[in-house]
């Protein structure tokens, strides 16, 4: 147990962790019993096949956990909406069933209070985004926002200071780090840019917003085997500066 972990702080101020149980091939959740998380309540949320090999968790506008994850058995993007703060049960939805989709998943809550999910479409080699239609995320608007080459691996999503989604991801075709800046709250369109093209770079990226309101991205430089950081110069993350 303990693969593909993702952690957030719940409305009760305690840690909530999603992860993959590789032995049982289940999506599991651990709700910390105290601030130090020296013990936790463990729940197998989804046991229907090989599910949860990649997970991402956030807290919804209703104060309950929302987990996006990959169903490897059916090759679907799935979402679990926790029924209580401890997440001892959840409503499970197969959100995107159009091909081999849902790996490299990342979830956040948009300015509209609804879930926004980035992930890979391995059938069509695209970066896709799902914008939840309700708090439970039982339905969503699905959009392929980058379709040029083999793109969308190991995505990371956040909400920029402009209230729009900002996604970092790996372009495997060109070996580049790319960023997509959503054009609207639903992210039905986006501006995409390769922000580091120096060698084979950009896998395993993570993105957040700094105190200056600009994106900050960490990622792997596989050519030089180094950790790199890109600091966005504006809300669109174009141009940018790099540090290593």
Positions of the model-derived regions?
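Extracellular, repeat-based ectodomains that mediate carbohydrate processing or recognition
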Residues: 1-244
């Amino acid at each position: 147990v303990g693969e593909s972990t993702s952690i957030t702080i719940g409305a009760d101020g305690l840690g909530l962790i999603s992860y993959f149980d590789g032995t049982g091939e289940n999506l599991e959740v651990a709700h910390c019993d105290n601030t130090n998380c020296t013990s936790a309540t463990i729940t197998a949320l989804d046991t229907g096949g090989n599910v949860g090999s990649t997970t991402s968790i956030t807290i919804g506008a209703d104060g309950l956990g929302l987990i996006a994850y990959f169903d490897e058995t059916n090759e679907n993007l799935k979402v679990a909406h926790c029924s209580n703060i401890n997440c001892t049960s959840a409503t499970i939805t197969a959100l995107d069933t159009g091909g081999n989709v849902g790996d490299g998943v990342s979830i956040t809550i948009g300015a509209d209070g609804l879930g926004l999910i980035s992930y890979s479409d391995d059938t069509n080699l695209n970066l896709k985004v799902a914008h939840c239609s309700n708090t439970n995320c039982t339905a969503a608007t699905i959009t392929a926002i980058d379709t040029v080459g083999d793109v969308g691996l190991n995505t990371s999503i956040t909400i920029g200071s402009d209230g729009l989604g900002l996604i970092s991801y790996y372009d495997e075709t060109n070996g580049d780090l790319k960023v997509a800046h959503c054009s609207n709250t639903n992210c039905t369109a986006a501006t995409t840019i390769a922000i580091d093209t120096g060698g084979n770079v950009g896998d395993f990226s993570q993105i957040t917003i700094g105190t200056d309101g600009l994106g900050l991205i960490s990622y792997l430089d596989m050519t030089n085997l180094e950790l790199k950081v890109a600091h966005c110069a504006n809300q669109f993350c174009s141009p940018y500066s790099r540090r290593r």
